Structures are given as C-alpha cells and as structure tokens.
C-alpha cells in the first residue's frame, strides 16, 4: 500500500484539483482539496494559451505562481489528514497545458516540478505527455488507461466520458484493448461565452443553455470544423477551439440571441460526443460521465435523449466522485512511472508502442 497525490489543472482553468489516493490492489480515493484559481493567474495562463509577446519570461513567472499555489494546497491536504510529507511516495503533477500540438511534435505543460519538490519535500513525477508524443502519439487523452484500471472488473460495454474544458471518451469493452479519443469542446466554449456575455465563469446546471434554442445554421457552421471529421487517434485543445474561433463563426452569420448561442454550444458538445461513439462503432450500454460536465443537468439530459439504448449516469453511481477522476488519474500515473509500468495506450494515442510516462524529480 502506498499513498500518492495527484494535482490537476485542466483547460477550464477554474482551479487546482488535489487528490490523495491509496494504491494497493485497488485504487482508493482518500481525501481531496480544491483551490480556486486566482483571477490574475487565470488571466495570465489564458493569455499564454493564446500566444503573445515575451512568452518565455511570462510562462516562467506564471509557473512559479502555479507551483506555489499547488504546494500550498498540498500542505493543506497533508495537514487536514495529519500526514507528513514522508508518508507520500510521490506527487503526480500534470502542470498547466499552454500549448498542445502533437502534429508538430510537441506538447507544453508548465509547472516547475523541481520547485514543487523543493516546496513539498516529496518526489514529483511530471511531464506525462511528452514521451507519448515523442513516440508518435497524440499525448492525449491519457486517462483511458486509468479508466480501464478503475472499471476493468465490470461487465458489459462501457464508455467513460470526461467533460472538462474538452470532452474525451474511453471505450472499455470485454476482450478488446481500451479505445479513446478527444471528441471536441466540452465546457470550454460554453464557459467562454457565458463569461463574455454575463460575467459568469460557467453555466450552472446548463440553465442558461436550457433557456435558449438551438440555431441550426450556427450548429452546422460549428460542425464544419475539420477536427470533427478527422479519424482517431486525435486530440485537441485551446489552440483550435476558443472564443476567437467562435466569434469568427458568428461573424459570418446573422445575429443570434446570446442564450441561443449557448444552447447551440451545448448541442455541439452533446452531438460530437454521440457522433464520436457512433463513429467508433461502439455498442455502449452504459455511459459514465465525470468532470464538470457531470453536473450540467441540461447536458446530461441531452446525452440521455441522444443515446436511448444506453444508461447515462455519473461515475458517482459506481462509487467514483466525478470531480476527482482526473486528479486521481495523475496520482496513479505517478505510481505507474515509479513502478516502470507503461501507462499510455497506443490504441488511444497512436504511439508506436507502450511507454512509461513521466519525468521523476526525486526528493
């Protein structure tokens, strides 16, 4: 039995998820801690994702601030659990993605793991995506292997859907290698639109989207992006889908009510998930949803409507808190790295083979 901490800061940039897991014959979530992202740091990270002048210095400063926030949260979690740093075998730190371009052979997550080791007194494993990209893979999604480890004992055809800033699927079917891929925007466009229009960070329960109606011409324009017809393995990010991308689509069309745009963005998320399942020829009997999207009542209902032959439910129905799956995954990936266990899945990322992921910063 060993204890690991996972730190995840996703594309939504709402905050840092910190999860403590116990790794033995099973994976158990022990405790969690969440730190909201300060507005100034969030704005700077968003700016780095978009690109601009003096990126090297700006990214160096931003990652120092990110690491200090992460270390603060880790110490708080340890204090709450009355644990000393020596009790933790390693921290799996994803860092913050500021650029993901596997077609050009690189992916960049900032997070200064050396400083995180110094500030916590705990070995840190980070840079999980680069090895898969170096092996010709997409470097994403990485969570399907973890989903497989969590749910491999279950029977039937199951898909695990993570809806964070972007949505990705893991297909777990008996006697088949796990499959997985990014579907497209999850919450990223809905969050950006409601923030621009109403100053809110997200659409609680999808209520604003539910107040509008889908605009077919806008939906058709959004779905015309080449990503949606690209065959997997594939991954995407803010480099492709962002507020300027949405505004460009809107500029070519007549004006729409703001709530109708939100409704259409939710429909885009739901449709691209379902079409991804269909293109994979998946006979999904159960769709388990995690990430922030699991709390979007309107999205969950729409997925259920579009998948009448599948049970659509939160991972909570299987005892796995939907808010902490990704942070748990990076704690588990740290375990895999230290044990020399390959944690990518070529059937998911397209890499040339199995690879041990992560770089180790020993305490």
UniProtKB/Swiss-Prot annotation:
Top-rank taxon, per record: Bacteria
InterPro entries found in the cross-reference section: Anhydro_N_Ac-Mur_kinase, ATPase_NBD
Pathway as given in its UniProt record: Amino-sugar metabolism; 1,6-anhydro-N-acetylmuramate degradation; Cell wall biogenesis; peptidoglycan recycling
Family, as annotated: Belongs to the anhydro-N-acetylmuramic acid kinase family.
GO molecular-function term, one example from the UniProt record: kinase activity
NCBIfam families attached to this UniProt entry: PRK09585.1-3
GO terms, biological process: 1,6-anhydro-N-acetyl-beta-muramic acid catabolic process; amino sugar metabolic process; peptidoglycan turnover
Enzyme class: transferase
Residues noted as binding ATP in the record, renumbered to the chain: 10-17
Protein name: Anhydro-N-acetylmuramic acid kinase
Job description of the protein: Catalyzes the specific phosphorylation of 1,6-anhydro-N-acetylmuramic acid (anhMurNAc) with the simultaneous cleavage of the 1,6-anhydro ring, generating MurNAc-6-P. Is required for the utilization of anhMurNAc either imported from the medium or derived from its own cell wall murein, and thus plays a role in cell wall recycling.
CDD domains in UniProt: ASKHA_NBD_ANMK
PANTHER family: ANHYDRO-N-ACETYLMURAMIC ACID KINASE (PTHR30605:SF0)
Record's keyword terms, sorted: ATP-binding, Carbohydrate metabolism, Kinase, Nucleotide-binding, Transferase
Enzyme Commission code(s) on record: 2.7.1.170
Keyword Translocase on entry: no
